[in-house]
């Protein structure tokens, strides 16, 4: 059993319903407090979710088999907390922050009632103090640094310390474990504090110290359709809803590999175990294109699969965002990938049903929208007291049943995110990957990105809007052609349709399994998009639809081959010259 704090409150089980227990107690209990239920001398972890008089309802994070009426329940006196400190990166945790590598040493399966420390107490970290005796500090200020991966991990005054403190003692530089006291301090009332490298924080409370500032930096992800059509800023929020088989998980894995951020928190809260295994097998052998290090050096994985208890699935998404906020406070850029928030919402629905609350649409709780909004609002860019800036970008995958974007989880998400990347089953079936549908997707950051890129390519924002115009018009013309055929439309419309198809095939589509095309750097995107803009503005001379189609198919083939060539290599330069010469053969004038 995990140690409790101070004078503990105890109670006993009076009713059990699945993993929801009704407990009568004598003393003081808070909502959200951690409790432990005694079952055959094994202590099961639980959380208080409702307090009514001298009775509480608790959700147990384990299988409640053998729980009987009168079973002893002990309340810990503290909320469900995350353990934060050096060693989180390269870690693989469940929703209760048990380190799965340690649990795997004892058994292939998780044993009931077995909990381990999130941070290894034996690992030594090379600590460099920054604070000196006499410094007056507040929560979030740096006490010192340790080297974690390729960046400095800031050891901070714990966020649970709400008063100004004066440093009275600092440890010397050296190698220490995370539970070593590295500094001591005293507040104005004379209370003494001892600070280690570890701090704890309730996962359902926002972890922030500093001023929220507007997002102003592009998050380059190497996917052309995202960087161009549906851009996201560092500190922004976006969602990727789509039906089964549309490619949500492959898209999220791509983001975790290539997004231009410092830290990636991968929160697999309710997806299939095989997908998590794929990440664990691939990531240690993949290289981060931005740093040259292993991808695992910047990744923390929290993996609650669908087979794990519903209650633990709900806590995993809060654990993920708390860890992400912790690294943001160090002035780092963090990306949180939650796959999938629909499973989290289903956990809320199940718990709400057991609490006998009045259901909302599709039996989801009435407060679903506010819970989702509160989650996404924890993202954003923050400026710290020392002037450094950190950001937390949130990407939530949504799995609507049957691809129905009108269901409550998708609608609640759309109202709070800054960008919507809707995945289409039709595009996935047509093998147009990534299957993000540009007709239904949007981004509130498009104008801001246009202003940022104005110095690199003049008129970027207008060019993207023109590309959107061609996509919309091309889609409408394509629908008419299905009815009247190619002969029933004028040549001008045929030209617009073929330009839209060229843009879709050569720019929006991308091969995630090609060694070169899987990641398209921003400079390469600018050059390719400039070529597309030139084609949009050009007028061509064709005497019949067949000649027009033949020309654009040849152009498609040349540009698609170009996408597979290494940027600025001799083959790439020769391929670009071939494309430009081919254009000049049919181009009559430029608008």
Swiss-Prot record:
The keyword Nucleotide-binding applies. InterPro entries: ATP-synt_VA_C, ATP-synth_a_Xtn, ATPase_a/bsu_AS, ATPase_F1/V1/A1_a/bsu_N, ATPase_F1/V1/A1_a/bsu_nucl-bd, ATPase_F1/V1_b/a_C, P-loop_NTPase, V-ATPase_asu. It catalyses: ATP + H2O + 4 H(+)(in) = ADP + phosphate + 5 H(+)(out). GO terms for molecular function: ATP binding; proton-transporting ATP synthase activity, rotational mechanism; proton-transporting ATPase activity, rotational mechanism. It comes from the Bacteria. Keywords: ATP synthesis, ATP-binding, Hydrogen ion transport, Ion transport, Nucleotide-binding, Translocase, Transport. One of its GO terms (biological process) is proton motive force-driven plasma membrane ATP synthesis. Its EC number is 7.1.2.2. Gene3D superfamilies: 2.30.30.650, 2.40.50.100, Bovine Mitochondrial F1-atpase, Atp Synthase Beta Chain, Chain D, domain 3, P-loop containing nucleotide triphosphate hydrolases. It holds the Pfam family ATP-synt_ab_Xtn. Produces ATP from ADP in the presence of a proton gradient across the membrane. The V-type alpha chain is a catalytic subunit. This is V-type ATP synthase alpha chain. It comes from Chlamydia caviae (strain ATCC VR-813 / DSM 19441 / 03DC25 / GPIC).
